Design a protein with these regions (language model features):
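N-terminal export/assembly leaders
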Residues: 1-82
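Periplasmic N-terminal accessory/gating domains of Gram-negative outer-membrane beta-barrel systems
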Residues: 58-59, 94-210, 217-220, 224, ...
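N-terminal periplasmic accessory domains that precede
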Residues: 73-78, 148, 185-193, 204, ...
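Transmembrane beta-barrel wall of Gram-negative outer-membrane proteins
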Residues: 232-235, 264-350, 367-380, 384, ...
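Face-selective signature of the C-terminal outer-membrane beta-barrel domain
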Residues: 329-349, 367-530, 659-684
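Structural signature of Gram-negative outer-membrane beta-barrels, strongest in the C-terminal barrel
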Residues: 428-430, 446-450, 456-458, 494-621, ...
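Gram-negative outer-membrane beta-barrel transporters
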Residues: 512-517, 625-763, 842-844
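C-terminal beta-signal and adjacent terminal beta-strands/loops
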Residues: 752-767, 785, 792-845
Length: 845
C-alpha cells in the first residue's frame, strides 16, 4: 500500500497500536501476542503511507516484518539482540512533517559529540547558525551551552520545550558578561541544560511550524523524555576527556589570557561524565524511567593575590564547572483509551571562577531549573483530547564571598581591584496549562477535514533578588599613608518583580482534496505586561504530484510572534536599588539626581514573516528535500540611552534572510553483506541583512536606513554591512553510520564543511568631519572537519558491555574561524579546536 493515508494513533501497547493501524489503513497485520507483550508504540500522527507507519511502530522493538501478500504483513522476532547498541534500526523519518527534523535516540547515541548538549546536537541542522567562535580552541574545557539562530532570527527568540512544556528563559537570556559587575548576572536562552544522551528524541521545527507553537521568532527545539517501554533495564555510562587528549591552537594576542585561564578561556582541564538510566516496571499498566547524569570539568586557572610586600602574585588552582541532571517520567495506562504521564525535571550548572586581574576574587556563576509536569491523553468517541499542566522554577545567579568591591590606588604603585558583590539572582516561575483536541477526519463530499484546536495559557513571575547590601568605592592613598574614599556606591538589598500572563487560542484544519492538501491555521495571543495582541496565520499548500506521496511540492506563508523579554520591565526597578553616595572627588551626590528611568511604553512583540517552498522526492529508498525559506524579521526590540539619562526600548530592528537547503537521507538501511548503513547529507546557503547585531540581542541599538559607515576604505550604507554574528553563508554535513551486528560494531563518520566567509572587524573612527565607524573585512577560508565514533559491544564475551571512542576533528584542521584585528600589535584571531579524543564505557543490566 503506497497511497498516503491520514493516521492518528497515540502511544499504545504495541499490539493495540498494530490493530488500530490495520483499522485505519486497511493493512492485514498478523503477530504472535508474546512478541509484542510489554512493548509500547510511539505516537503516529500525520499523512504518509501505511507501510512506512508500520516501520515506525516497530522501530527499536526488536521485531521485523515480512510481506505475506498484497497489504498483508507478518510480525516476527528479529534474530539480533534488540538491546544491542550496534543494531541499526530503521531511522524514524516517515512521520516527520515538512519543516521538522527528528533526532531519535538511536541517532543521538551514534553521533560523535563532546559535551552532549542540545545546541551541539542541532548545530549542523541546515537552518541553524552558531556564533563563529563556538568551535574555537580558547574555551574548550567549559561546559557552557552555545546560542543558536534559525534563519537569521534572534538566538534569544527560540522556543525550547521539554515534552511540550516551555523551557525557555524569558528574563535576560542575552547576558553573556562573565565579569564581576554589580547587577550583572550572565544567563542563557535554555532554562534547562539537558544531557542529550538521556532523551528519547529531539524534535526541531524550523519552517512550516504548526500553529500549536507560539512565542518564538526563530525555531522550536522540543526535547522528548523517555517513556517506559515495558521491560526493566539499568544502564551506566562513564565518559572522559582531558586537555592532553585535545589539540589547541591559540593566537599570540590571546595566549596570555588563555594561559592564565581568564574567564572565557580554559588552558587545561579534566572532564568526567557519569550517567544512569533505569527503566522500572510498577505493574502491567505502569512504569517509570529515571535518568541521571553528572558532567564536570576541572579547569586550571590562575588567581591574583599579593605577597607580603604587597606585590601582585599569580597562583594556580583548579576550579570546577559542572552540570547535574535528573529526569523522571512515570507513565500509567489505566485502559486502552487513556495515558497519563507525570514528569520531574532538574538541571543545575555551577561554574567556579577566579579573577586574574582582581586580587583574592573568587565567584561562581550558576544556572539551574526544576519543574513538574502532568500530561493526560484520552480517546473520545470521535476525537482525542490532550491536557497538560506544568510548573517550572528557573534561575541564574552570581555568588561571591565578598560583598565589597574596592578599587585601590596606592601611592606611586599600580592600581588593583579586590572583592565582589555578594549574591545577585534573576529568576522566573512559570505556570502553564494547555489543552488540545484532535477530531477524527471529517469527510464532506470530495473534501476531508483534519481539525484540531487548543488553548495555551502561561504565567511567568520574573524577579531580581539581592539578599544583602554590597558596596563599591575607590580608595586613594597619599604619601603619608592616609587615604580618601570616592565613587562610593551602595547596591542595596531588595527584590523587584514583574509578571507576564499570556493566553493563546489556536485552530488548524488540513483540508484534503484529491492530490491537494491545504493546512490553514490561526493563532491568537494576548500578553498582559506589554498589552500585546497578535494574530498569527500559518498556511501550507501541498501538491502530491503523482498521488503516491513520492513527489510533493509545498509552499506557504506563516507569521511567528516572539515572546517578551522581562529584563526590560525589571531593569528600572533593579537600577533603583543602586545608590551613589559620593562622586569621583568624594563629594556627596544628592539623591534627587539618581532617578533611573527605563521607557518601554508602546513596545510590541517582534515577529517574523516566513515564505517557504519545498520539493520532496522519495525513490529507491532515499528521500531528498530541496527548500527555500525567506524570513522578514520586523519590530525587533532595540535599546538606546545611557544610565544617567535613561534607557528606551523600541521596535526598531529589522532583518531579511534568504536561505536555500538541500538534504538527502536513507529511508531504510542499506545492506552490504552482514552490515547495514544509514546516510544523511545536507547543504545550506544563507544571506542576511540586518540593522542590529544578533549577539547583542535586545541590548543593541538599530542603525537607520541612511546611516553610513566606512567598509574596506569606502563609505556604504550601514544596512549593507555584512552580518558580524551568527553568520556562515554555506554549511554542509555528511553523516554515514554503519553497523556490523555480528561483531557488535557501530561506526559513524561525520564530515562538516564550512564555506569561506568575510569576517567584519571594527578598526576605529574615520576622519572628520563625519568620523564614521570604520570596518574592515577579514577573509576566512573554507575548511573540512571529520568527526568519528566507534562503538563495540563484544557479543561472545560481554554483550552488555559497550566501549566507545569519539574523535572530533580527526584530521586536526585548525584554521582561523574569527579574524584578528589588523590594528593590534599581535594577532588575536580565534582558531578551530583541534583533534579531540573522548573515551566512554557503558554497561547495561
Amino acid at each position: 500500500m503506497n497511497d498516503a493515508v491520514r493516521l492518528c494513533i497515540p502511544a499504545l501497547p504495541l499490539g493495540d497500536a498494530l490493530i488500530e493501524l490495520g483499522r485505519q489503513s486497511g493493512l492485514e497485520i498478523s503477530f504472535p501476542p508474546a512478541a509484542v507483550a510489554g512493548k509500547v508504540s510511539p505516537v503516529v500522527r500525520g499523512r504518509f503511507p501505511a507501510r512506512l507507519a508500520l516501520d515506525q511502530m516497530l522501530e527499536g522493538s526488536g521485531l521485523a516484518l515480512r510481506a505475506e501478500g498484497a497489504n498483508r504483513y507478518l510480525i516476527y522476532v528479529d534474530q539480533p539482540d534488540p538491546t544491542h547498541a550496534s543494531r541499526l534500526d530503521p531511522v524514524r523519518v516517515y512521520g516527520e512533517q515538512l519543516g521538522e527534523r527528528v533526532y531519535s535516540r538511536q541517532e543521538i547515541a551514534t553521533t560523535p559529540s563532546s559535551n552532549r548538549d542540545l545546541s551541539t546536537l542541532v548545530a549542523t541542522h541546515p537552518a541553524v547558525r552558531t556564533n563563529p567562535g563556538a568551535h574555537g580552541a580558547q574555551n574548550r574545557g567549559s561546559l557552557d551551552i552555545e546560542d543558536i539562530s534559525f534563519y537569521g532570527a534572534s538566538p534569544y527568540q527560540n522556543l525550547f520545550q521539554i515534552d511540550g512544556i516551555d523551557a525557555t528563559n524569558r528574563v535576560d537570556p542575552a547576558n553573556k558578561n562573565l565579569a564581576q559587575v554589580g547587577g550583572n548576572v550572565p544567563s542563557n536562552p535554555q532554562s534547562y541544560f539537558i544531557d542529550a544522551s538521556l532523551l528519547e528524541a529531539v524534535h526541531v521545527h524550523d519552517s512550516f511550524v504548526p500553529v500549536e507553537y507560539g512565542r518564538f521568532n526563530g525555531g522550536v527545539v522540543d526535547a522528548r523524555l523517555r517513556r517506559f517501554a515495558g521491560e526493566n533495564h539499568l544502564k551506566f555510562d562513564y565518559r572522559w576527556n582531558t586537555s592532553n587528549m585535545t589539540r589547541q591552537r591559540v593566537s599570540p594576542g590571546q595566549e596570555n589570557k588563555w594561559t592564565q585561564g581568564e574567564p572565557g578561556f580554559t588552558p587545561r582541564w579534566q572532564k568526567r561524565f557519569y550517567s544512569v538510566v533505569a527503566d522500572i516496571a510498577v505493574n502491567d499498566k505502569a512504569g517509570m524511567v529515571l535518568a541521571m547524569s553528572h558532567r564536570q570539568s576541572r579547569i586550571a586557572r590562575w588567581g591574583l593575590s599579593a605577597d607580603d610586600a604587597g606585590k601582585s602574585l599569580r597562583t594556580p588552582n583548579n576550579y570546577r564547572d559542572r552540570i547535574d541532571n535528573f529526569l523522571g517520567k512515570f507513565s500509567v495506562r489505566p485502559d486502552a483509551d487513556t495515558l497519563v504521564d507525570l514528569t520531574l525535571k532538574y538541571s543545575d550548572r555551577s561554574e567556579a571562577l577566579t579573577s586574574n586581574t582582581a586580587r583574592d576574587t573568587q565567584y561562581a556563576n550558576n544556572h539551574g531549573a526544576y519543574g513538574l509536569a502532568a500530561r493526560l491523553e484520552h480517546r473520545l468517541p470521535a476525537a482525542r483530547l490532550t491536557l497538560q499542566a506544568g510548573w517550572d522554577h528557573a534561575m541564574s545567579n552570581r555568588r561571591s564571598t565578598s560583598r565589597e568591591w574596592v578599587t585601590t590606588r596606592p601611592y606611586r604603585l599600580p592600581v588593583y581591584f579586590k572583592g565582589g558583590f555578594g549574591r545577585e539572582q534573576k529568576q522566573q516561575d512559570t505556570v502553564l496549562l494547555k489543552g488540545r483536541i484532535d477530531l477524527d477526519p471529517l469527510r464532506a463530499r470530495a473534501f476531508t477535514h483534519n481539525v484540531y484546536a487548543g488553548i495555551d495559557a502561561q504565567r511567568i513571575d520574573a524577579a531580581f533578588k539581592r539578599p544583602k547590601l554590597s558596596t563599591a568605592y575607590t580608595r586613594t592613598y597619599g604619601s603619608t599613608g592616609g587615604y580618601t574614599d570616592s565613587n562610593r556606591y551602595l547596591w542595596r538589598p531588595g527584590t523587584v518583580r514583574a509578571r507576564s500572563q499570556t493566553a493563546a487560542l489556536y485552530l488548524s484544519d488540513r483540508v484534503e482534496w484529491r492530490r491537494l492538501a491545504l493546512d490553514a491555521g490561526l493563532r491568537y495571543d494576548h500578553e498582559s505586561l506589554f498589552g500585546s495582541h497578535s494574530v498569527a496565520p500559518r498556511t501550507r499548500l501541498d501538491w502530491d504530484v503523482l498521488g503516491s506521496g513520492a513527489t510533493v511540492l509545498s509552499g506557504g506563508w506563516s507569521r511567528y510572534f516572539g515572546g517578551a523579554v522581562l529584563e526590560t520591565a525589571l531593569e528600572a526597578r533593579r537600577l533603583r536599588l543602586l545608590q551613589q553616595l559620593t562622586d569621583f572627588r568624594g563629594n556627596p551626590v544628592p539623591a534627587g539626581k539618581q532617578d533611573f528611568a527605563v521607557d518601554y511604553s508602546g513596545l510590541r512583540m517582534p515577529y517574523d514573516d516566513e515564505w517557504a517552498f519545498s520539493l520532496r522526492q522519495r525513490m529507491a529508498g532515499l528521500e531528498g528535500l530541496l527548500g527555500y525559506v525567506r524570513r522578514d524579521g520586523r519590530r525587533q526590540w532595540i535599546k538606546s540611552g545611557k544610565i544617567n539619562t535613561g534607557f528606551t526600548y523600541r521596535n526598531g530592528g529589522n532583518s531579511t534572510t534568504d536561505a536555500v537547503s538541500l538534504t538527502l537521507r536513507t529511508l531504510e538501511p542499506w545492506r552490504a553483506g552482514p552490515t547495514r548503513w544509514h546516510l544523511q547529507v545536507s547543504w545550506s546557503w544563507q544571506k542576511r541583512k540586518t540593522n542590529t547585531d544578533l549577539a547583542k540581542g535586545y541590548d543593541d541599538n538599530a542603525r537607520g536606513p541612511n546611516d553610513r559607515v566606512i567598509y574596506n576604505g569606502a563609505p556604504i550604507r550601514t544596512i549593507d554591512l555584512p552580518p558580524r554574528s551568527f553568520h556562515q553563508p554555506q554549511l554542509a554535513a555528511l553523516t554515514l553510520t554503519g553497523a556490523y551486528p555480528r561483531a557488535g560494531l557501530t561506526w559513524t563518520h561525520t564530515l562538516n564543511w564550512r564555506g569561506r566567509r568575510d569576517d567584519i572587524i571594527y578598526v576605529g573612527r574615520g576622519p572628520g568631519p563625519s568620523f564614521l565607524d570604520r570596518y574592515q573585512s577579514g577573509g576566512l577560508p573554507s575548511y573540512w572537519t571529520w568527526d568519528t565514533r566507534l562503538s563495540w559491544q563484544p557479543p561472545p564475551v560481554m554483550p552488555r558491555l559497550e566501549l566507545t571512542i569519539d574523535i572530533l576533528n580527526l584530521l586536526n584542521r585548525m584554521p582561523a574561524i574569527v579574524a584578528g584585528n589588523p590594528t593590534l600589535a599581535s594577532n588575536n584571531a580565534t582558531y578551530q579546536s583541534g583533534r579531540e579524543l573522548w573515551l566512554q564505557v557503558g554497561y547495561r543490566f
